């Protein structure tokens, strides 16, 4: 078993990716690892012709994944948009792993992200000693993706300042990255594209300019439609977490997962499941990702401070922490 706390998607699911490539029967775009159809099978799960079972990475509307993958065959970039905790980063990572075999070409967007994180930077010691040169140039993940024909990822695009966001316009429209200091440019090769993620809930985000919006095809990832779908997502992710962390606790009973998911869904909707009682909606999103965290925390509590079997009391503190984000508003 790997000692890594978290493997990249292409490492964790290497066997599945290998089997999909070995059983490929559809046309594969240049510099892609597999066909768009196989990428969707990798995301949604399924049984291959040789009987091999591919586990689902995304549980939800298959059509959304088909639209997302089809976008990346075109000249438009992909923007995964939605509430926090709707698997935007998870989907982005797995699409990049399936298409390029590399999900690590990533820029994490923050309020402090500058142009040099997207375009290129400089090794200032060499820049002062040699002046502008190829040796002094520091490549960014986006530049590497262009040169290698891979998928580049930008997380939390709307957290980046609007002026910095717009440095992507030339990259996405003309598929070139000018380097005027060296009187040259980097031209993207086939297979290159960008997957960006953004959420529509957090405060302090910067809206995309209309010019940049036109360069993206936006796919909105919703919260799970049904309670059974959400329970299945939580169960699968918790089982995966338990294997990695090797917690001294039994797998949580499905009923405990159902209890957490039901509480979260009722609070999100502002009413009990039967619709008879109205509830105050908290300030937090109470997403599926937070439900997973609550159950994981409950497992740790049960394993180290309980009898090894998860009970309601092991989940209470996690639920309280997820619900009460603002002590005043959520009182």
Label every model-predicted segment.
Residues 171, 263, 317-318:
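Short acidic/histidine-centered micro-motifs embedded in hydrophobic/aromatic stretches
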Residues 91, 266, 321-325:
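A short structural micro-motif
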Residues 35-36, 209, 224-226, 250-253, ...:
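General structural signal for secondary-structure boundaries
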Residues 303-331:
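C-terminal engagement/docking regions of AAA+ P-loop ATPases
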Residues 159, 214, 274, 329-331:
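Proteins with a high burden of low-complexity, intrinsically disordered sequence enriched in S/T/G/P/A and R
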Residues 75, 102, 129, 219, ...:
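Amphipathic alpha-helical interaction segments
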Residues 231, 238-310, 314:
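Conserved AAA+ ATPase small/helical "lid" subdomain
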Residues 2-246:
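AAA+ P-loop NTPase catalytic core and its hallmark functional loops
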């Amino acid at each position: 078993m790997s000692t890594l706390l978290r493997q990249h998607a292409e490492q964790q699911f290497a066997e599945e990716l290998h089997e999909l490539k070995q059983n490929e029967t559809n046309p594969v775009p240049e510099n892609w690892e597999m066909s768009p159809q196989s990428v969707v099978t990798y995301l949604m799960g399924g049984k291959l012709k040789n009987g091999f079972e591919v586990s689902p990475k995304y549980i939800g509307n298959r059509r959304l994944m088909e639209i997302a993958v089809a976008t990346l065959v075109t000249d438009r970039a992909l923007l995964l948009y939605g509430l926090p905790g709707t698997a935007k980063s998870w989907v982005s990572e797995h699409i990049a792993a399936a298409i390029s075999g590399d999900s690590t070409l990533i820029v994490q967007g923050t309020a402090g992200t500058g142009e040099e994180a997207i375009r290129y930077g400089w090794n200032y010691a060499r820049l002062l000693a040699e002046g502008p040169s190829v040796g002094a140039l520091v490549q960014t993940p986006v530049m590497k993706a262009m040169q290698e024909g891979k998928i580049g990822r930008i997380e939390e695009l709307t957290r980046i300042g609007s002026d910095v966001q717009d440095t992507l316009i030339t990259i996405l429209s003309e598929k070139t990255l000018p380097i005027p200091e060296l009187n040259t440019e980097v031209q993207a090769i086939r297979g290159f594209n960008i997957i960006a993620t953004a959420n529509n809930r957090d405060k302090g985000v910067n809206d995309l300019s209309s010019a940049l919006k036109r360069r993206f095809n936006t796919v909105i990832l919703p919260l799970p439609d049904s309670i059974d779908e959400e329970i299945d997502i939580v169960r699968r992710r918790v089982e995966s977490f338990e294997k990695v962390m090797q917690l001294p606790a039994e797998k949580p009973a499905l009923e405990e997962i159902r209890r957490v998911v039901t509480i979260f869904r009722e609070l999100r909707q502002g009413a009990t499941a039967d619709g008879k009682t109205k509830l105050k909606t908290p300030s937090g999103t109470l997403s599926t990702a937070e439900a997973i965290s609550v159950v994981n925390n409950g497992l740790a509590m049960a394993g180290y401070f309980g009898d090894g079997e998860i009970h309601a009391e092991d989940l209470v503190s996690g639920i309280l922490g997820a619900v009460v984000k603002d002590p005043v508003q959520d009182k």
